[in-house]
UniProtKB/Swiss-Prot annotation:
UniProt protein name: Small ribosomal subunit protein uS5
Gene3D superfamilies: 3.30.160.20, 3.30.230.10
Domain statement: The N-terminal domain interacts with the head of the 30S subunit; the C-terminal domain interacts with the body and contacts protein S4. The interaction surface between S4 and S5 is involved in control of translational fidelity.
GO biological process: one example: translation
Top-level taxon of origin: Bacteria
PROSITE patterns reported for this sequence: RIBOSOMAL_S5 (PS00585), S5_DSRBD (PS50881)
Function recorded in the entry: With S4 and S12 plays an important role in translational accuracy.
A GO term from the CC aspect: small ribosomal subunit
Keywords attached to this entry: Ribonucleoprotein, Ribosomal protein, RNA-binding, rRNA-binding
Taxon lineage: Bacteria, Thermotogati, Thermotogota, Thermotogae, Thermotogales
Amino acid sequence: MADIAQKIKATGEDFEERIVEIRRTTKVTKGGKNLSFRVLAVVGNRNGKVGVGVGKAREVPDAIRKALSAARRNVFKVPIHNGTIPHEIVGRQDAAKVLLKPASPGTGIISNGTVRAVVELAGIHNILTKSSGSTNPVVLAQATVNGLKNLLSLEKIAELRDITPQEVIHGVKKEG
């Protein structure tokens, strides 16, 4: 684990950390109940990089440390255009679905707490979201991550359509 911390420090990235959920879990055995804790953490630099992680341990501080370490290992890049996402997308994970829609400047982040934590730390300022299905915070966070990972940048969209990025933003005028 020291290697991960050294890699993060070596890159010079300064990630903001947020604990989304701390849940006490119980395993019942013939010897009694075993208590442990599950923590959902999000890290991001508010500039297009975000990661989500889950940690489990018998003590809360250990679970938090494990969750933050897992989140730092899972950091990925999010394409952002004018403070929002380039296009609409649906993220799915198990029984949860999260619809992510770009919003005009000044809209803010319209979402529930779990999705808000992920998109805020990614650096998105204007977005509309709608979650349906499961309300489990871990599954919602993973569905949001799946949606953000499947976003295409404006350059990639332009390349696929064989037009310039400016034409993607402003639309292409039809000839004829």
